[in-house]
Amino acid sequence: AAECLGVNSRIQLAQVTKVMQRRINHAHMAAGVTMVDPDQVWIGPDAKIAQDVELLPQVMLMGTTEIGEDSVIGPNTRLTDTKVGRGCVIEETVAIEAQLDDAATAGPRAYLRPGTHLCEGAKAGTHVEIKKSTIGRGSKVPPHVGQRSK
């Protein structure tokens, strides 16, 4: 029945979009991706996700985003045209045209703008915003730097 749905209103567009999103999510789960709540995960048709990735609620993977094995994404995370290596942890983060190498972490509430590169094991901490910068292997960008930081 879903193969012949028409789109003549915003309501019908939402219904057809939901059908397609379920198909995309089910295909990824069949390939070994874990979704805690598939109804709260949005994956664009061009995103690539390796097996053993865990997607938590409120995740959006847009454009040509790629996620490497054993990474955990979310909750509340939007990645657009972003490359994520193996074993990364990204929570409550927005990343646009960024690259995270293996074992990098971001968040909570990090904003990785275009040109951001987190090298292997690097961390962008809480409330950090980075643009057109490379964070070296094992380096950390904390939310506070200086005398009163802990």
PLM regions and their residue ranges:
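Structural signal for interior beta-strand "rungs" in well-ordered beta-sheet cores
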Residues: 34-150
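Terminal amphipathic alpha-helical/low-complexity segments used for targeting or macromolecular assembly
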Residues: 1-40, 45-46, 52, 87
